[in-house]
Amino acid sequence: MQAGPVQAVPPPPPVATESKQPIEEEASSKEDPTPSKPVVGIIYPPPEVRNIVDKTASFVARNGPEFEARIRQNEINNPKFNFLNPNDPYHAYYRHKVSEFKEGKAQEPSAAIPKVMQQQQQATQQQLPQKVQAQVIQETIVPKEPPPEFEFIADPPSISAFDLDVVKLTAQFVARNGRQFLTQLMQKEQRNYQFDFLRPQHSLFNYFTKLVEQYTKILIPPKGLFSKLKKEAENPREVLDQVCYRVEWAKFQERERKKEEEEKEKERVAYAQIDWHDFVVVETVDFQPNEQGNFPPPTTPEELGARILIQERYEKFGESEEVEMEVESDEEDQEKAEETPSQLDQDTQVQDMDEGSDDEEEGQKVPPPPETPMPPPLPPTPDQVIVRKDYDPKASKPLPPAPAPDEYLVSPITGEKIPASKMQEHMRIGLLDPRWLEQRDRSIREKQSDDEVYAPGLDIESSLKQLAERRTDIFGVEETAIGKKIGEEEIQKPEEKVTWDGHSGSMARTQQAAQANITLQEQIEAIHKAKGLVPEDDTKEKIGPSKPNEIPQQPPPPSSATNIPSSAPPITSVPRPPAMPPPVRTTVVSAVPVMPRPPMASVVRLPPGSVIAPMPPIIHAPRINVVPMPPAAPPIMAPRPPPMIVPTAFVPAPPVAPVPAPAPMPPVHPPPPMEDEPPSKKLKTEDSLMPEEEFLRRNKGPVSIKVQVPNMQDKTEWKLNGQGLVFTLPLTDQVSVIKVKIHEATGMPAGKQKLQYEGIFIKDSNSLAYYNMASGAVIHLALKERGGRKK
């Protein structure tokens, strides 16, 4: 055998071992997410960030871009997920890994790491998607109701241990002995401050009540409590479910709280980003004085307030209220349209005209198409139910009444539109002001002056008639002075006689009134008569009663001389012709003209302040107890009483021509009136009255009294029309009773009444017998003036 060169068997090439190593590397490369060869142009993130990027890319590749958007929304504030932003430097690496995972090239990383670390890493890798999925599931499951509260947990308040023991011990006894024990304890310890927690207004009362409930459940447990405890002891899973639900509820509450805080934070940031001082002037509009623009008309404060109320009503009630307001405005427009033709005829009332115009308009208009039926009305509320006893269900139902056009009534005081339901209250409030009559008259006058064009037909007719009466030069045949009617100059008003009431307070006023009514010619005639230069007219200057002209005059009866008292001095009587009445000499006070006086019953000199009641003239026999004077007696100057004409004496003398230069004579006072005068001719005073007791003895029984009421047209609230009121009263009644009856008959308050009987102002506190009132007595009623002197 030929031996050849011995060649040694070469050792196994290292490739075998090397080939083994790449296999391990390939196996390990399946776990290593990093590529075998780095890609040029991509920035690789650090290892801690690369792990998050790779895991996110794997989930995005499997779940789609919706999962990426969800992660971006949930982790918007997490800086570790900034690689999701396109501007981030690691975003290119993230996109590269997503494409690799979609193509199946990329694998999970597994570098030379201990096995324990690899297991932990795998656990964390598997834990992340589970967390994300758990979050997605938890967002869908929301706890509906809160878990039941803990029954045996009550946080003790911050009080001392002794007080806490007192509260707990009291709660135990109350739970054991019942509420009756609590009531007795409260009554017994109501003054003990340590038991103040038993009062409901105390701060520890709620804690005490909670303890009582807990002790009661322990001492007297409910029915299902034992079965529940037994079930939970046998099945701990149920307790865990309750705990899990409570935890989920706590997490849900926390998420809601965080969400609210985030919304508030976003809103705060948004407000903080606004620059409130940064603005841009886009355009400046200047309006010239003569420029005309399409602007709304100016509004008054009243219209502005009405618009604000309408807006508030619309915001509060919505569109329904606006519809009602539009309906009301349409009704008002119809009323305005109806009032325009109604002005042509003023003889009818406004309501009749409105009704007539409505009928005419309805007759002219085409009947509208049938509308949809109205929905049934709501059931009446209890306060609107009206029970009718005479209701007959079988009777024919009346036609539905037409809608009342007078829902709003015009107030006669203010002229405003007032609802009919509130008119009574409006009138009551409006009439509280006593000046509403003046305001109403003033407004009517102003309205008439403004609306003269629309005067009614009767006013125009009366105005033309008055114009024709006073312009006879145009409308008449007989011409008079312009502005005067035919026969107006002949008709003269009767002179109003000025009468002094006897009070010093009215002296100046009466004097002025007397001077205003006397002309210059009358003053000259009075001076001539006083000087005796002109024969006196006996028919005018005569004082006292006189007989009518058609009755033949008779001589005085001889029996009248017997009435002279024996104590009086002898008086010589001078016979006089019966046809000539005695003239009167009057005293004229300086600066006061002589006025013709009405005939008076008697002449008596009275002190100032007395009152002379005018009496009608009564025909009787001539007097003989008068002191004669020469016919040419000069005027006698008397001391200055009130500035009126004062008759001094009767001068019975035959008519003889007066002597121009008579000798002065001393003043002669008239004698007192005789007792034979009738009682109506004598002026009474309280001193001359008969005592009340004596008058009651002489007169018994009730008397009939007549009260003469004045005619005062300006006092419309009182019935003062000049009528006479007759009352029958006993003599013992006071004057105040008469005033009460006058108030009942006329409405005049007793405080405004002033009663006068035979020249005496009677007082309320005195009786009728005090003033000697007999049957047929006449009492004059007057108005008590305010602010004047007490009368």
Swiss-Prot record:
Q: Where is the composition biased (Pro residues)?
A: 366-382, 664-673
Q: Which residue positions does UniProt flag as site: Critical for binding to SF3A3?
A: 169
Annotated compartments? Nucleus; Nucleus speckle
Cellular component terms (Gene Ontology): catalytic step 2 spliceosome; nuclear speck; nucleus; U2 snRNP; U2-type precatalytic spliceosome; U2-type prespliceosome; U2-type spliceosomal complex
**Disulfide pairings:** none
Q: Where is this region: Required and sufficient for nuclear import?
A: 678-700
Positions with biased composition (Acidic residues): 320-336, 352-362
- What molecular function terms (GO) are annotated for this protein? RNA binding
Does this UniProt record's set of keywords contain Cell membrane? Answer: no
Give the UniProt keywords, A-Z. Answer: Acetylation, Isopeptide bond, mRNA processing, mRNA splicing, Nucleus, Phosphoprotein, Repeat, Spliceosome, Ubl conjugation
InterPro entries, alphabetized: SF3A1 (IPR045146), SF3A1_dom (IPR022030), SF3As1_ubi (IPR035563), Surp (IPR000061), SWAP/Surp_sf (IPR035967), Ubiquitin-like_dom (IPR000626), Ubiquitin-like_domsf (IPR029071)
UniProt feature, compositional bias: Basic and acidic residues: 21-34, 386-395, 486-500
UniProt subunit comment: Component of the 17S U2 SnRNP complex, a ribonucleoprotein complex that contains small nuclear RNA (snRNA) U2 and a number of specific proteins. Part of the SF3A subcomplex of the 17S U2 SnRNP complex which is composed of three subunits; SF3A3/SAP61, SF3A2/SAP62 and SF3A1/SAP114. SF3A associates with the splicing factor SF3B and a 12S RNA unit to form the mature 17S U2 small nuclear ribonucleoprotein complex (17S U2 snRNP). SF3A1 functions as a scaffold that interacts directly with both SF3A2 and SF3A3. Identified in the spliceosome 'E' complex, a precursor of the spliceosome 'A' complex.
Protein name listed in UniProt: Splicing factor 3A subunit 1
Tell me the gene name. Sf3a1
